[in-house]
């Protein structure tokens, strides 16, 4: 799993995930499933933010060209991925500036258009159960919750999905990609089931090679939120080709 993570995700995302785990005394080389989950969550948070800006009229717009415009500001403030001290500093600054209530737990994003903190979830389990767990933990109607699953489902507070359909589809396609690449290497079952993960760890199973013809390398171009991978889900033709390649994967 560790090899898969380092190959599938941009190095800067991997580095952030490693720092996050070490801050809590966890070892990415041992808790590899958590390592993969944190990288996935980080990437979804960055994708959620990418290309979304607020214009001079306060309207939300999407800009993908990278053409600089001084009148535009990022719609989302990314809190996830920062060390705890810096993250709380950012949260306190937002609360002092906007007047919103300070959340009890660190959220993932702040939405300047809707003036609310946002909690992003990525689950391998039943989405409704995971959503309720998040809601019960946060216990605040003022923090917006948006959950994505690896099966293409999503659930959000009051069915308010915040982003346009295309932006959400990019996230779902990326999660689909991650799931299929894990499955092609025999890693998906252990990622979903902790019991299976322990069994594989005891047997010291090695990861299988990637599916023939399946892209496993990422480009390292700069995105608006982070120097993250160039999204291969951006182009519908490439997405269709990618899905077709999954169907042709040979089971070993």
UniProtKB/Swiss-Prot annotation:
InterPro entries: PA/PA-X (IPR001009), PA/PA-X_sf (IPR038372). The record marks 202-203, 206 as: Important for efficient shutoff activity. The record marks 195, 198-199 as: Important for efficient shutoff activity and nuclear localization. Keywords: Decay of host mRNAs by virus, Eukaryotic host gene expression shutoff by virus, Host cytoplasm, Host gene expression shutoff by virus, Host mRNA suppression by virus, Host nucleus, Host-virus interaction. Pfam families: Flu_PA (PF00603). One of its GO terms (biological process) is viral translational frameshifting. Belongs to the influenza viruses PA-X family. This is Protein PA-X. It comes from Influenza A virus (strain A/Chicken/Hong Kong/220/1997 H5N1 genotype Gs/Gd).
């Amino acid at each position: 799993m560790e090899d898969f993570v380092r190959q599938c995700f941009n190095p800067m995302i991997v580095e952030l995930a490693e720092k996050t785990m070490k801050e809590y005394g966890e070892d990415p080389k041992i808790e590899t499933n958590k390592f993969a989950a944190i990288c996935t969550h980080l990437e979804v948070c960055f994708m959620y933010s990418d290309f979304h800006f607020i214009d001079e009229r306060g309207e939300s717009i999407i800009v993908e060209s990278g053409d600089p415009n001084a009148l535009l500001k990022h719609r989302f403030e990314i809190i996830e991925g920062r060390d705890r001290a810096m993250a709380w500093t950012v949260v306190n600054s937002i609360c002092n500036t906007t007047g919103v209530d300070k959340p009890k737990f660190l959220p993932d994003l702040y939405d300047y258009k809707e003036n609310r903190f946002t909690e992003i979830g990525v689950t391998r389990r039943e989405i409704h159960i995971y959503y309720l767990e998040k809601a019960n933990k946060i216990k605040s109607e003022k923090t917006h919750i948006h959950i994505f699953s690896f099966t293409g489902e999503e659930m959000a507070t009051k069915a308010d999905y915040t982003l346009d359909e295309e932006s959400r589809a990019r996230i779902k396609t990326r999660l689909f990609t991650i799931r299929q690449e894990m499955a092609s290497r025999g890693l998906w079952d252990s990622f979903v089931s902790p019991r299976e993960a322990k069994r594989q760890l005891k047997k010291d199973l090695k990861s299988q090679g990637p599916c023939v013809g399946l892209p496993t390398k990422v480009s390292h171009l700069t995105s608006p939120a982070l120097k993250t991978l160039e999204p291969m889900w951006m182009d519908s033709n490439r997405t269709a080709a990618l899905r077709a390649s999954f169907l042709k994967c040979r089971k070993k």
